[in-house]
Amino acid sequence: MPPSTSLLLLAALLPFALPASDWKTGEVTGKVVEKSEFPCYSLSRDNYTCSACIQYHESCAWCGAPMFDEKKPYARCDSRAKLMEHGCPNSYIEDPATKLDITEDSKLSDQGQVESEEEAVQIKPQEMYVEIRPKSRVRFNVTYRQAVDYPVDLYYLMDLSYSMKDDKQKLSELGDLLAERMRTVTKNFRLGFGSFIDKKLMPFIDPRIEKQLSPCPTPCAEPYGFKHQMSLTTNTAKFKAEVDKAEISGNLDAPEGGFDAVVQALACNKTIGWRERARKMIVFSTDAGFHFAGDGRLAGVVEPNDGTCHLDREGYYTETLNQDYPSIALLHQMIKDRKANVIFAVTKNNQDLYTQLSNALPDVSSSVGVLANDSRNIVDLIEKEYLKISEKIIMVDNANASEGLKLTYRSMCLDGTTLKDTNVCEGIRVGDEVQFEVTLENTHCIDKRDFVLRIGPSGLDETLIVNVKVLCDCDCERQDRIVTNSADCNGGDMVCGVCRCKGGNVGKYCECNRPGMSTAALNEKCKRTNESAICEGRGVCNCGRCECNPRANPEEQISGEFCECDNFNCPRHDRKICAEHGECNCGKCICAPGWTGRACECPISTDSCLSANGKICNGKGECICGRCRCFDSPDGNRYSGAKCEICPTCPTKCVEYKNCVMCQQWQTGPLNETACDQCEFKVIPVEELPNLNETTPCQFVDPADDCTFYYLYYYDEATDNATVWVRKHKDCPPPVPVLAIVLGVIAGIVILGILLLLLWKLLTVLHDRSEYATFNNERLMAKWDTNENPIYKQATTTFKNPVYAGKAN
């Protein structure tokens, strides 16, 4: 074995990510994940010890210096940087570091041939030592490479009920071919054989004596639970002979007792002959279903299966009548613990059942193959399913979350591009190398401190052994570091800078001697009510009096007899405590002069509400908290604007001054002369309106001449006077051309009539031409009769005498 490689990694010195070169070279690396910031000072004072501190968070450290928190109320539990900043000597800081040390790291090798003394190495490294503190993580790489000619032990478990008679014969004939085919996969191959029927109990078998002796239609052997027929060997001729010699039997119900056989094949390691460093294969061949835990109760068997070996000298399972069938959970655990691989070779009608069984066995290597009715395809099936199992690697471990240890995996598998969360890689051929990034995390502490983790591929007895020590305790808590009968603790013991009182004394420095009063009784004096926490959970009870915890921000202080008050939990305005216009005192704001309100957000002065006319909120509202709250207008709508100067439905000054402008400048509009004289202003006629920003432009149409007139006004709210400028000239529309419109209409009508006549003429011409063309076509196609004219009459008429008899002889 080459010398061990040692790699020590401290959490404060190493980065988070693994370098890319690690994936390319396959070198083993270890990384401690960087610490994150955490408010360690919030550790509960009810359990304020060094070990509780380092277990609180990975970034928490403890200052064990005596009297460290005497002058200033600094927290002993804080980050290392904060403790040093507050003056804690480095030698007194308890901050255990996570480290990783690789103790065995042999190279991957293919030396697994039969004649080789050395065993193949498929996983790297082989052993490491990790010290990990609570709530921290450490990462390392595990490399796997499938070796050439890795040893394979194949144990064939066959259902020898009567329906499998032809299958037994075919297996006997194919024994040599099976061994020959498997040796093309690996030269280091051994073969074993066992058989099973069912429990020899009713209702699983026929209770009649003659049927118990020979349950088959033709003579056959008595039923049995399981029989080990042949141990693992390279002698294939013996395998063929043992299969041929094995006797067929039978049972009554359809399911078989195959689970008993699997458990015994796994439990009887020496009898079967399993090698420690070999791929253990069990081929489970049947044409029926299976019995499992609970079925034995039908026959009165209630004792659970213990999962241990019970074979006699002849290889028979001796507890078949005493123990129930194994549960699927027991089957899964034994396959996982023994690092075995199972191939279920079943007939087509049972494929779905055994596929469900295979899926119920997580993190173990199992597969299902369809067996021909006479098992003629058994060789191809085993070869195919073996390759399927061997080409898939599942990384498994024995980490127990309840013990505070958690392992997670990431890998690029064979694509080498994307690192993904998985513990499974597929398509692994002989010589292929895959790497897994493993993260070990401690989530909490238990009484146990030392653990042995085993990480390795499912179905292989090769593992990485990780010896783990969880750093849940501080060195200053060791017995040889405790200062007993310390003067600083008034005779108590000083542990990590904190006094541990004895002899009835209590208090921070054991200075309280209250005969007849327990610490619990003193703690009751530090509660505001019976239901309250001690010092409201924000301080410690010292001799029956509360000492409030310090805050990380020195400007924030907790106070009060029971630490019920502070200066940072008051109402805020714009995210500012008391709007920065007062002081926070025990949850209430004490406002500075000139300010009021729950959060001192309201000025007492109403200056901010004064409008230009000197009225508060323009006389249309009230000033509340420095802002105008407007009243409703006479029509029920609310005034608006910063000073309530806007009335959405009130008439504007433009509309109000319109009639006065019309009557004064042009003597038009609805006002008579008397009403016009009563207008509150006199217009100022100008050629062009002045360009003043503070004036409001107005324009209206005079109904008398349909001309638009313009004027500007300025209203002085202070004096309630208006100044109005009006432009002398109106903008009148041009006169309507009546004659042109009439002539245009007449011309349009005439032209339209002419166009209609022309259109009518065009249509008639086209129609006549069509009729004439039709007539010519009919004339040319006509065929006239050549007889006489039917209306022609000749000029002469001949009459014959009807009584004329002719000439006499």
From Swiss-Prot:
Q: Which residues lie on this side of the membrane: Cytoplasmic?
A: 759-809
- Could you tell me the gene encoding this protein? pat-3
The VWFA domain is annotated at 153-352
Assembly and oligomerization: Heterodimer of an alpha and a beta subunit. Interacts with alpha subunit ina-1. Interacts with alpha subunit pat-2. Component of an integrin containing attachment complex, composed of at least pat-2, pat-3, pat-4, pat-6, unc-52, unc-97 and unc-112. May interact with tns-1 (via C-terminus).
Tell me the PANTHER family matching this sequence. Answer: INTEGRIN BETA SUBUNIT, INTEGRIN BETA-PS
Q: In which tissues is it expressed?
A: Expressed in body wall muscles (at protein level). Expressed in gonadal sheath cells and spermatheca. Expressed in vulval cells and along the basal laminae that separate the vulval cells from the uterus (at the protein level).
GO CC annotation, single: lateral plasma membrane
For this protein, the record's InterPro entries field holds: EGF_extracell, Integrin_beta_N, Integrin_bsu, Integrin_bsu_cyt_dom, Integrin_bsu_tail, Integrin_bsu_tail_dom_sf, Integrin_bsu_VWA, Integrin_dom_sf
Which example biological process does GO assign this protein?
cell-cell adhesion
Q: What is its main location?
A: membrane
Write down what this protein is called.
Integrin beta pat-3
Name all I-EGF domain ranges.
Answer: 476-511, 512-564, 565-601, 602-645
Where, subcellularly, is it found?
Cell membrane; Lateral cell membrane; Basolateral cell membrane; Cytoplasm, Myofibril, Sarcomere, M line
